[in-house]
């Protein structure tokens, strides 16, 4: 019979008026006690040509009556077999259920469609290998509180099952079940409820947790602290506000908001804070290397005016967190000089170099401050920004003339001479005569004496004329302020040049006269 008749029944949407009851019965399009059946669209039927029902509701009714012929017809019309089983359970039509048992497979799949507790329990009973625990888990999942109430005595004796159901109710967000379990039997620990509420961002469950906790007359300070830390770390403003209703320290919230860059949370509370408190938060933001937007938010509430400059600079340098300085520079609040002074005085050359690179401070500016504070290590380390040694010497040489303090000049010349001594001999020759004149001008006798020795190491053809010219140039540089040691060195080499017959006696006498006039 499958065949043409079934094919017709499946696709027949319009019944001809000439079809009488007998013809409809023969076609299987007649429902006893109800009337003719006609398909309407994909998911509805028409009974007696005037009553429209959903296909699944009709299946439930047919199942309740145990009318397998109508069930088969409605299944052809894309009905869901699960509704036929629900109806069969409501009408105790177990013969019909057994006919479709193999097609169902797992009766648990039907449970979400069932509205009443009695049918729910009867459906679960069809699963032969499931016990009470499984029934109660599914009752929790689908919010069948009456079933749980039926088994209240058993739950009160089985603590593990009770705790499990409570946790499942949290995961499935079944508030009525949560309330009933806690109020009738209590659970060992409500922390699981709060943890799940926070992870699911479920404010309703979170609030319910505090209601249940308050009913116990137990709001521990440690628990409030933990909740404030967790919710503020995640930026959950409304969870934070809910917690603060029951107590807790707002400083915890602000600390977490700064640490995790939750500006919405921070902005909500900043309006209520005094200036000193905001300045402390700014220091924390520097310490935690907060984002640009977080720093801008804090600074905007301070009108970009920071009173505790020294402390701010100490934090910037100590935690190598220079972003706040960049922001203030854009607002024309120049803290570079003040920061450099602190930085050079107290911190290592490596740390100074790192901050210099971050803030794009010129090396010359850092070196001058380091010379002022007599930090030779910083001068040397910073000068390595110029990779070429000859360039380093040239840059430092130019700086000598801009330094006012004699002790600073001497220190810089020592650094320069150290760089010179590390040059290859061929490279030394390129700068030795220029440096020698600088040393004479700056009364650097020790360095001048040493560089003159290097000049003697040149081959004779190059040495004699160039060294003679160096002595003549130095005579033009010497002044009344030149130290006695420089004069002695010049005298020695002038006499030496005369001995080597590079100078005439007349030239020698003239040079010595100029030297000591």
UniProtKB/Swiss-Prot annotation:
Keyword annotations from UniProtKB, A to Z: Late protein
Organism domain of life: Viruses
Pfam families (alphabetical): DUF249 (PF03158)
Keyword Transmembrane annotated: no
Secreted as UniProt keyword: no
Induction: Expressed in the late phase of the viral replicative cycle.
Disulfide bond sites: none
Family: Belongs to the asfivirus MGF 505 family.
Function: Plays a role in virus cell tropism, and may be required for efficient virus replication in macrophages.
The name this protein goes by in its record: Protein MGF 505-2R
């Amino acid at each position: 019979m499958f065949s043409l008749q079934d094919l017709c029944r499946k696709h027949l949407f319009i019944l001809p008026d000439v079809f009488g009851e007998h013809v409809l019965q023969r076609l299987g399009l007649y429902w006893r006690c109800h009337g003719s059946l006609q398909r309407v669209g994909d998911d509805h039927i028409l009974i007696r040509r005037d009553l429209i029902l959903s296909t699944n509701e009709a299946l439930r009714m047919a199942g309740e009556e145990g009318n397998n012929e109508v069930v088969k017809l409605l299944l052809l019309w894309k009905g869901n077999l699960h509704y036929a089983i629900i109806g069969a359970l409501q009408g105790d039509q177990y013969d019909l259920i057994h006919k479709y048992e193999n097609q169902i497979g797992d009766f648990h799949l039907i449970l979400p469609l069932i509205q009443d507790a009695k049918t729910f329990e009867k459906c679960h009973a069809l699963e032969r290998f499931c016990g009470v625990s499984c029934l109660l888990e599914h009752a929790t999942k689908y919010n069948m509180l009456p079933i749980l109430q039926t088994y209240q005595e058993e739950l009160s004796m089985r603590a593990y099952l009770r705790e499990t159901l409570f946790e499942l109710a949290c995961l499935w967000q079944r508030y009525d079940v949560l309330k009933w379990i806690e109020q009738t039997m209590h659970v060992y620990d409500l922390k699981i409820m709060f943890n799940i509420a926070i992870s699911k961002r479920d404010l309703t469950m979170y609030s319910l947790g505090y209601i249940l906790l308050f009913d116990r007359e137990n709001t521990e300070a440690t628990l409030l602290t933990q909740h404030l830390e967790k919710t503020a770390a995640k930026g959950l403003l409304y969870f934070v506000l809910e917690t603060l209703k029951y107590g807790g320290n707002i400083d915890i919230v602000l600390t977490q908001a700064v640490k995790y860059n939750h500006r919405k949370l921070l902005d909500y509370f900043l309006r209520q804070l005094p200036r000193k408190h905001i300045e402390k938060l700014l220091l924390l933001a520097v310490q935690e290397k907060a984002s640009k937007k977080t720093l801008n938010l804090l600074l905007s509430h301070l009108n970009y005016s920071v009173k505790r400059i020294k402390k701010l600079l100490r934090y910037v340098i100590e935690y190598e967190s220079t972003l706040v300085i960049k922001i203030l520079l854009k607002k024309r609040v120049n803290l570079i000089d003040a920061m450099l002074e602190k930085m050079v005085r107290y911190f290592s050359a490596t740390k100074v170099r790192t901050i210099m690179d971050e803030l794009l401070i010129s090396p010359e500016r850092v070196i001058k401050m380091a010379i002022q504070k007599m930090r030779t290590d910083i001068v040397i380390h910073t000068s390595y920004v110029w990779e070429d040694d000859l360039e380093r010497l040239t840059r430092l040489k130019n700086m000598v003339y801009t330094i006012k303090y004699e002790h600073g000049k001497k220190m810089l010349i020592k650094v320069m001479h150290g760089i010179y001594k590390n040059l290859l001999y061929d490279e030394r020759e390129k700068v030795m005569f220029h440096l020698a004149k600088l040393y004479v001008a700056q009364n650097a006798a020790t360095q001048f004496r040493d560089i003159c020795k290097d000049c003697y190491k040149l081959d004779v053809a190059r040495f004699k004329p160039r060294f003679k010219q160096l002595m003549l140039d130095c005579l033009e540089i010497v002044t009344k302020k030149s130290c006695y040691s420089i004069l002695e060195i010049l005298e020695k080499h002038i006499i030496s040049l005369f001995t080597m017959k590079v100078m005439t006696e007349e030239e020698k006498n003239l040079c010595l006269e100029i030297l000591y006039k």
